[in-house]
């Protein structure tokens, strides 16, 4: 989980880049911060002949990190924008920026194809194309959706070199963006308390360029004037809370600056976003193993204060009410966590080959399939894959996703 603190040139280290989906809800950002094993000198020389054996040129890593830091900022501030393709099929600006970055890395001479990842992508795409050509050809499917998924998965196959010092620079850039996001949470509340309402970025984006199927303006309580903070540029409060939640996990695991951790914690509670809180809670067992005792003691001492603050501003009451949503159909909690699992289970039980091969790209309704679907719904990626590509497609997609994000021993990011 950790890396040494030395600033000397290191052997390659691995951190993942997880692309965001623009045809379904983006997968939540991982809270893991894995480090890779060193690349053998022979393999390093083969990949980068100009590098010293066993090390990466710091100048190369610095240039790569510069591009990735700028890219990270641009992806965050443009996530509400998308390029319309056909119907509800869109390509997020984030994806366009990612491929632009790939082009820059090609020109820099640092982009490489990771063989194992590439073969796993090829296996899924080949399966999908054969099934759509033979099995789903008559029932119809969305070529645009299939093409979009191919673009998304292909991003997993590309890697670039990195060392520890510049890896830290990328993480620090993420943390600084999270500071701004946390400040925007308080700005959102401040303008509402002042009677100015909450700034709505969608008022300034042409409809056809808005990234659809996200609840950007989300009421805190139905029929009440208050809106949950959206951080202005974030897709919705869940994305904002996940971003801040991951910053809190990174801060505790990596940098351990208590003032930053406190800022993220208060902002996370003030966002009223449940998914970011769940992300932190899911990471807690791993953090307890990593953190020195004095930090654990600080967390234990701060917990009662945070609970009091949470109770005073209504967070605990809100979370209690949200907890009941899991059993209430059409509620946010049900749609986000329960409905995808139920829909996936029903899809696997379809007659004939439907459970194994799926019903075709783009076929999942924008809502509960048993109730005709509803407009404005973004599915969890796993449910979309199971429904449209079947059990076999899911068994090809899941290892690829887990390997690309969580595996160790890759000498690149």
Predicted regions and their residues:
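Long extracytoplasmic/lumenal interhelical loops at the membrane interface
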Residues: 80-87, 317-389
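Alpha-helical transmembrane segments of multi-pass inner-membrane proteins
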Residues: 172-196, 218-272, 278-289
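Loop-to-helix entry and N-terminal half of a specific, functionally important transmembrane alpha helix
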Residues: 67-77, 301-305, 404-413
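A membrane-periplasm/extracellular boundary helix in multi-pass inner-membrane enzymes
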Residues: 183-192, 288-328, 347-350
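Transmembrane alpha-helical segments and their membrane-water interfaces
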Residues: 103-109, 136-193, 397-401
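N-terminal hydrophobic segments of proteins, predominantly signal-anchor/transmembrane helices
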Residues: 66-81, 98-157
